[in-house]
Amino acid sequence: MKKIAVDAMGGDYAPQAIVEGVNQALSDFSDIEVQLYGDEAKIKQYLTATERVSIIHTDEKIDSDDEPTRAIRNKKNASMVLAAKAVKDGEADAVLSAGNTGALLAAGFFIVGRIKNIDRPGLMSTLPTVDGKGFDMLDLGANAENTAQHLHQYAVLGSFYAKNVRGIAQPRVGLLNNGTESSKGDPLRKETYELLVADESLNFIGNVEARDLMNGVADVVVADGFTGNAVLKSIEGTAMGIMGLLKTAITGGGLRAKLGALLLKDSLRGLKKQLNYSDVGGAVLFGVKAPVVKTHGSSDAKAVYSTIRQIRTMLETDVVAQTAREFSGE
């Protein structure tokens, strides 16, 4: 049985969206058990599942504006902290939260703990491409600064994930840069390039540019945390902008535009779904001793369900243990 500790109080629509997503996951997956951490009375309002689920009550939670590290240290009974401790103590196999990203990263670093020989765990997510296959990118902001050695580790981590969780036999690994030529980039990018070229275990395809990411140029894209987070926000903003422009064009375009939208309704719905990468799951803090997964703060029940499905696959494929063995040299 795969045991998942869930912070029921994190996120914009908690606990309703969290619990409703859990209900659906428990219905569909008979091999998971969920521990819900949070306000028992509020959780029970939405909990319909009666088997393989438990509630661990706490009145304390971490708010979105709390300073991450201080919150983890001072709010010992917060729902997120208790969920992370359950993983550390072996009472759960993975932790999920839609709450404060920085606090969850801190919980992953300081409570769950790093895998031996991994210097800086990175935040990774599967982002959308035009062909619907997506690409994995890390680091998306777990670290403000990185070395070439960190980026090399991210390439190995991302490749492991793409192989074992997404089923890609030979993941194409690209280094995000300001040009595709091998001579491009600052000293960090140039040093990283040399490390990736020298690693024969990687299917390294060279430098990739941000403009080509959504065209599926690579299966795994490696970046420092600052750059990766900026790219992530750009993709999110572009997706919202496209949908906003379409809505404005339709509502302000008169009868012809509305009729056209009606005819294209299924296609537009498909486009919206394709741009909504939360259907794939959450962002994984990769490099810690167990799956620590952050679903978007505005996640609805469907996104929570998708993230639980993602965690289930990670546990099923034992990707974290495989990664630990690889980095420990066993």
From Swiss-Prot:
GO biological process: fatty acid biosynthetic process; phospholipid biosynthetic process
Alphabetized UniProt keyword annotations: Cytoplasm, Lipid biosynthesis, Lipid metabolism, Phospholipid biosynthesis, Phospholipid metabolism, Transferase
UniProt EC number: 2.3.1.274
InterPro entries: FA_synthesis, Phospholipid_synth_PlsX-like
Pathway involvement of the protein, from the record: Lipid metabolism; phospholipid metabolism
Location of the protein in the cell: Cytoplasm
Database matches in Pfam families: FA_synthesis
SS bonds (residue pairs): none
Predominant subcellular localization, coarse grouping: cytoplasm
Keyword Cytoplasm among record annotations: yes
GO annotations of cellular component type: cytoplasm
UniProt KW Lipid biosynthesis keyword: yes
GO molecular function: phosphate:acyl-[acyl carrier protein] acyltransferase activity
TM region positions: none
Catalytic activity: a fatty acyl-[ACP] + phosphate = an acyl phosphate + holo-[ACP]
Annotated function: Catalyzes the reversible formation of acyl-phosphate (acyl-PO(4)) from acyl-[acyl-carrier-protein] (acyl-ACP). This enzyme utilizes acyl-ACP as fatty acyl donor, but not acyl-CoA.
Sequence similarity: Belongs to the PlsX family.
Quaternary structure and partners: Homodimer. Probably interacts with PlsY.
Name assigned to this protein: Phosphate acyltransferase
